[in-house]
Amino acid sequence: MAYDHKAIEKKWQRYWKQHKTFKATLDKDQKKYYALDMFPYPSGQGLHVGHPEGYTATDVMSRLKRMQGFNVLHPMGWDAFGLPAEQYALKTGHNPADFTNQNVDHFRDQIQSLGFSYDWDREVNTTDPNYYKWTQWIFEQLYKKGLAYEDEIMVNWAPDFMGGTVVANEEVVDGKTERGGYPVYRVPMRQWVLKITAYADRLIDDLDLVDWPESVKEMQRNWIGRSEGASVKFKVVGHDGVEIEVFTTRADTLFGASYVVLAPENELVDQLTTPEQKAAVDAYKEEVSRRSDLERTELSKEKTGVFTGAYVINPVNGEQLPIWTADYVLNSYGTGAVMAVPSGDQRDFEFATKFNLPITPVVEGFNGEEAYTEDGAHVNSGFLDGLNIKEAKAKMVEWLEEHDCGGKKVNYRLRDWIFSRQRYWGEPIPVIHWDDGTTSLVPEDELPLRLPETDNIEPSGTGESPLANIEDWVNVYDENGRHGKRETNTMPQWAGSSWYWLRYTDPTNDKEFASKEALDYWSPVDLYVGGAEHAVLHLLYARFWHKVLYDLGLVPTKEPFMKLVNQGMILGSNHEKMSKSKGNVVNPDDIVDQYGADTLRLYEMFMGPLEESVPWDEKGLHGSNKWVQRVWRLLMDDNNHLRDRVSTYNDGKLTKVYNQTVKKVTDDFERMHFNTAISQLMVFVNEAYKVDDLPLEYMKGFVKMIAPLMPHLAEELWSQFNESETITYQPWPTYDEKALVEDEVEMIVQVNGKVRAKIKMAKDADNKDVEDAALANEHVHSFVDGKDVKKVIVIPNRIVNIVVK
């Protein structure tokens, strides 16, 4: 009979749940392995077939490691705060908590139907007050360390969108919201900010400690954007004591500076603009306020700007340079000011060309048609003339330091992390602002500061979060009657995901976020699998929080995740990204119902290398299901009993291929090359179908090897061997090195250099025996009969060349 996936999968999922088969307990005598998935946001759409790919990969590794004797921690949880739930609630009038819990239940059911070996007793949910109590507690440690502060930050304010709200840079297109097309303005707003820049160097340097894809490391290095250069101070003409400081990586080009640019938001713009230019500058600032940072810094964008009417003195040659304001300079980068050298920077060149500003060549090679950025001898550069870039940089930095108008400096592209959102559905920030101007933290023994339940989650319209509407929650009094207001901004969705792997080690602890004992034993995460879209922000924020906790002596390792793997994307069958709008989304529930979870798991691991993006293919899925059935039929007869040919008798016919399979599958699983491991398992099954007797020892080993991939099928087959215990903790099969030795080789036989036959010989056979066998071969006869054999050349184990005349 065919394999009944529905009955068998339900049976074993029930068994695992009842027996808590995958429960992890701290055992210091056992070596540990911590396999972690990036926990999902439980959306209303539920799982799609892209989710199980990464989850199956970590599950294969978790099941392998258990069988190899490791104590495995393999947990799952929910990154459940987030904007979609709030937007859904606004649209429908439902409570975002109810909507989120309903989605979590649906996700959990879907994930459990796929047979993943999670320890569900460790499940976490970022919206659970018992969880976010510790998110708030960590925020308080950041605050005490001076790493959390308030600042006026330029934000994208859309007064007409959702009743007035802040939108991210990525959500602004042509000065309007991406959704709805509402006008967006750049306005300053009070925000909480985390000082991630204090860790910039360590976030770069410690990438050397982890086994991550080089592409991800490079993306993080570029995001942090450490650049070594110099600061240069320009005195402003007619303004005593006022200087404009710029950062440059090309101090050697200072002789070629022809103007200075201030970001429109730079406070010096209003201070320095002349009365004659004020109207033009104000109009320009208003225009720029409707552009996002992304739009402003597009390289292909038409350059815009306005002259302020003011000048600075170039310290190196005394020339007066005009001060312009232009949107391609961001106030959030460096000092919000740049020195412009049109002959050496393409943006400066385009700007100078448009506004007819001087362009002075300072390095040989400039052709007047575009900026020259290659190396060369300096010209028009006084004491730098004739030097190359490296020499000239060093000499100019020396000169700046000697003359007290600048010096060596390191700059970072990384900005501090804006940590507040004007939203309801997030962790409340545990801060009180008192009427006397002071700020205090909510006492630790009063945490969690719970998110108040309310029907009114409409935006406040003032830029504050909807929490500002809840008067009795916002207003507080201390024991002396002093009045204060709670912080109404909430934390971003990144907060809960910046430490969740630590909570999994001790998820029910109500005294601390996790005990030292649990953290010391389980840390760090050995394998972390998730999408490449999180290569920068989530991983950077998580590493930052981890390092802060390390500095506080609360975690034992400098880095949280030792090995990172990004699974590829599963595309639609048309090679496009799966999306509801394209109608190409495949629901895993349908696949599990029709073919079973083991088929889906097998197919997703067999599609191609784990890291590559591949299109969904129904034929491939069907082929995987056929192989599941083929494995079942190999061992089970039509009455669903173990076949008689499975016995303790071993005639040796499968010995070589079995040992080869154990070696290859073990090696490939360890390297997460699942597709090639499956190919080898298929080779073994093909060979097993060719022989009369199936040795019990080899069949047990084979079933163990398929267990990480197809656990339901493996458990059922294992039970058919009269085994009473789960296969989960059975020892992983080993191979015999001696059985892998090739005792026979295939040799090519050539006659006068042309291939005429192939012969099998014992490895390292005597040359005389090889000659005799070659000459005796029936395919060689016709080419040597009646001819004079001049000589026979034998290249051991490879070629026999017979020379005839």
From Swiss-Prot:
GO terms for molecular function: aminoacyl-tRNA deacylase activity; ATP binding; leucine-tRNA ligase activity. This is Leucine--tRNA ligase. A motif ('HIGH' region) lies at residues 40-51. The keyword Protein biosynthesis applies. ATP binds at K580. It is an enzyme of class 6 (ligase). It catalyses: tRNA(Leu) + L-leucine + ATP = L-leucyl-tRNA(Leu) + AMP + diphosphate. One of its GO terms (cellular component) is cytosol. Its EC number is 6.1.1.4. Belongs to the class-I aminoacyl-tRNA synthetase family. The gene is leuS. Disulfide bonds: none annotated. It is found in: Cytoplasm. Keywords: Aminoacyl-tRNA synthetase, ATP-binding, Cytoplasm, Ligase, Nucleotide-binding, Protein biosynthesis. InterPro entries: aa-tRNA-synth_I_CS, aa-tRNA-synth_Ia, Leu-tRNA-ligase, Leu_tRNA-synth_edit, M/V/L/I-tRNA-synth_anticd-bd, Methionyl/Leucyl_tRNA_Synth, Rossmann-like_a/b/a_fold, tRNAsynth_Ia_anticodon-bd. NCBIfam families: leuS_bact (TIGR00396). A motif ('KMSKS' region) lies at residues 577-581. GO terms for biological process: leucyl-tRNA aminoacylation.
